[in-house]
From Swiss-Prot:
Keywords: Cytoplasm, Ribonucleoprotein, Ribosomal protein. One of its GO terms (cellular component) is cytosolic small ribosomal subunit. The keyword Cytoplasm applies. It comes from Bombyx mandarina (Wild silk moth). This is Small ribosomal subunit protein eS1.
Length: 263
């Protein structure tokens, strides 16, 4: 009989002994996701990340994460009918246990888009790239449908090609006017009640009556250089009450600082 080591036993240890299972959640921490101050509900939810370990910093792993939230969860209960509108928020900075997010895009749910499309009408779409006053480049998509006139006896309500081109041109003009003269905060405030789409519907009524006009999607193509002060202002935590350098503090005449009893 050959004498030697049993390689199988030396590598694996004792036969039948199971490895200790470590719960991966013990190495993770929970962080609160905060939406910008444009929305009435700031607490969006929570997210997990591995704890800081060596050169791997937890906050760096959170930056750049994108959260998709329904508008009904971001606004008051009375706005529940707007649940088909989804906002995308991107994590830009971490303050303590709070992840501060910024606007990253907007979209409609698939079921809402499918519900709007009907027979015997013309679908009109337009998209345009616009730049806000604070340096964000957005691609805005708009959609609308021709509406049957109440006095018309026809079953269909198809628009002519010239009318479609005129409506598409009007859509681009109104989107450009409303976005280029506004900051990102003001653009988001217009997207929440969809006021841009209402302006388009009124302006295009003279060309052809429209229904279900809405901003279908918004993409953020380019962002300005990141500044923590602007992000804090967006979250309503900016130093609006900060004293500018060189300002004199108001003190009564003959003011003397109090004497300290101990140092």
């Amino acid at each position: 009989m050959a004498v030697g080591k049993n390689k199988g036993l030396s590598k694996g240890g004792k036969k039948g002994v199971k490895k200790k299972i470590v719960d991966p959640f013990t190495r993770k921490d929970w962080y609160d996701v905060k939406a910008p101050s444009m929305f009435s509900k700031r607490q969006v939810g929570t997210t997990l990340v591995n704890r800081t370990q060596g050169t791997k910093i937890a906050s760096e792993g959170l930056k750049g994460r994108v959260f998709e939230v329904s508008l009904a969860d971001l606004q008051a209960d009375t706005d529940a009918e707007r649940s088909f509108r989804k906002f995308r928020l991107i994590a830009e900075d971490v303050q303590g246990r709070n992840v501060l997010c910024n606007f990253h895009g907007m979209d409609l749910t698939t079921d809402k888009l499918r519900w709007m499309v009907k027979k015997w009408q013309t679908l009109i779409e337009a998209n345009i790239d616009v730049k806000t006053t604070d340096g964000y480049v957005l691609r805005v998509f708009c959609i609308g449908f021709t509406n049957k006139d109440s006095l018309s006896q026809r079953k269909t309500c198809y628009a002519q090609h010239t009318q479609v081109r005129a409506i598409r041109k009007k859509m681009c003009e109104i989107i450009t006017r409303d976005v280029t003269n506004s900051e990102l905060r003001e653009v988001v405030n217009k997207l929440i009640p969809d006021s841009i789409a209402k302006d388009i519907e009124k302006a295009c009524h003279g060309i052809y009556p429209l229904r279900d006009v809405c901003i279908r999607k918004v993409k953020v193509l380019k962002r300005p250089r990141f500044e923590i002060s602007k992000l804090m202002e967006l979250h309503g935590e900016g130093g609006g009450g900060k004293r500018e350098a060189g300002d004199k503090s108001e003190r009564p005449e003959g003011y003397e600082p109090p004497v300290q009893e101990s140092v």
